[in-house]
Amino acid sequence: MTNSHGEKRCTRYKLQKTVRERGISPVSKAIQEFEEGQMVHIDIDPSIQKGMPNPKFQGSTGKIVGQRGRSYILEVRSGNAMKEVISLPQHLKPQKY
């Protein structure tokens, strides 16, 4: 059997909640708002598949560049390149200074 090349390959532990985090996500995560230029961390919520960024960006930090519908456009550094990542607010968390 050949290896799969799907979007969620190699994410067995990356997209897994701990025992205490299991269940429905709080509504406050869905209605949180961010401003342009704000720094946020990508923290994928595996219980919500819609608007999920690519798992390779899990744990990375980016700057909010704009909004597209309910989703936010982030600018994230990947190596030497700057990438644009589109994500729903459920998968983002504000950076604390």
Curated annotation (Swiss-Prot):
The keyword Ribonucleoprotein applies. It comes from the Archaea. SUPFAM superfamilies: Translation proteins SH3-like domain. The keyword Lipid metabolism does not apply. Keywords: Ribonucleoprotein, Ribosomal protein. Coiled coil: none annotated. GO terms for molecular function: structural constituent of ribosome. GO terms for biological process: translation. PANTHER family: 60S RIBOSOMAL PROTEIN L21. It comes from Methanosarcina barkeri (strain Fusaro / DSM 804). One of its GO terms (cellular component) is ribonucleoprotein complex. This is Large ribosomal subunit protein eL21. InterPro entries: Ribosomal_eL21, Ribosomal_eL21_arc, Ribosomal_eL21_CS, Ribosomal_eL21_sf, Translation_prot_SH3-like_sf. Belongs to the eukaryotic ribosomal protein eL21 family.
